[in-house]
């Protein structure tokens, strides 16, 4: 067998490397590696040479069959060396936007692969000559049944559902390819960064596997230095957005399953040793309980982690406006931390103060804009910078303002957040998954507090270890990406999940993990009201022992009579702040009628009037995030002429037109 043939079968190469010493003659024949080997003693000699490390062979007598075995062994060893070079997934790098990057956004060629012909053979086994090879015919008779360069293009970042009408409902595999010129810089390494790919992504560079990632809303990156070459290169991504019971989110959810590379793609240039992540916050108090940043401490805490456990590396922190220029040295684990005296102006919705920050290590300088604030609870109050605050919020899906498609830019974020500002909001719930980094940063600049959430939504596979690992990975990635955003005050771990011991064990582990990663923010989740007797609601949920803020969704007026709202009483047996994380009802913009006629603007308007009056009677109410800012696409909403695959609970239509209920909520917030 030639080296060229073995190159086409990496699984076989790996088998050879691992099993050569244990293979029998029958094994060689069965695997089709070498045929007609005569004289088992000659084979044993080859194996003995490996044990004795006597390669090249030193014994004199060589037969034709032994020489064949030598050639095979040479091939194995050579391919072993080749296969060790490649790409590796590396931990998420904090603040991509503040580093040296090259954008790969723009037009990507795509091929729709309904039966995954480009990945599996006809026996459903992965094979080594899939679409990721980007193969071209070398002779007139060569059979290659795909061609990226002749395929159509779509924009990245972007979803395929709204860029190709044939793919509006499509859930499956699409291959995307981008060619680009690259010239390596001496002494630097290159990471390939994706802001998000929904949902299952296999990534290839120049025909070789860079890595695999699962999860549709958080960033990931690979070190692809050894896969890139000087000159023309290409990246191919196999994207699959099919839904599965063990996924997070699971098979059913009430939003559009936008497939594709939905956020930025960048090449990131780094030094061999670089700052992987860092955190800046106000100094922690030393009171009882979990440490929280303290307004009166007069200190700033800085910590940083290198990509390698390298001691003695110098990291410099500079905040010019605060006259900070301080060096700190890493320990044996590659981390460094320091507490500095400083009294920055505190970030708030009224004064969203941000400071320019520079972090230098070696030849690399990272820039950021960071604010400082405190967030804590006291009894049933939420305190921002030591003062009680009422969170005047709204829930938002990550969907463009102009009719649909996944939002993916600062401009998209600014439009949606401006609508929330016009409503009188100081708070947004980014539902039901981590939104793109542009949205969080734009909210910070605009003075908008943020609730950020992972998609543990409805019916998760609570007892599946892989499902938990997936959820924890998404939680970790969300926190690592946004841990320096002053406006993020709540990490949410779930939405509307059914009560069970298995669910409690799953979610309490997530809450614990969130606190381990970041004890400077509040933990919550959107619960359901499950204990109701006539007009008395009692919020009973074991998870309330694990959260800092009790949050629940209720739809009085939509899933029960709107007139019941005035009769409702609420019992929340916890000395914790309360957020009503969802309420509302649907209306189609421009449809008018009596206030008891469902789907009219008047029905929604009256529902908001009755609900806001009811909310005023809830003891300990610290905020609310009604459902939802704008109408959004959902395959579950099929009522022709009304829903047309839109959830109509928005205060704006999908085109940005205000419904009557907008003014009810705006006026109510003006009193808070």
Predicted segments, located by residue:
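Short, positively charged and aromatic/hydrophobic N-terminal segments
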Residues: 6, 11-14, 22-25, 33-36, ...
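Short Gly/Ser/Thr- and charged-rich N-terminal loops/segments
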Residues: 27-32, 285-295
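Substrate-binding clefts and catalytic carboxylate motifs of secreted carbohydrate-active enzymes
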Residues: 94-121, 131-133, 154, 197, ...
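Active-site-adjacent substrate/metal-binding segments within catalytic domains
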Residues: 141-143, 152-181, 186-205, 211-212, ...
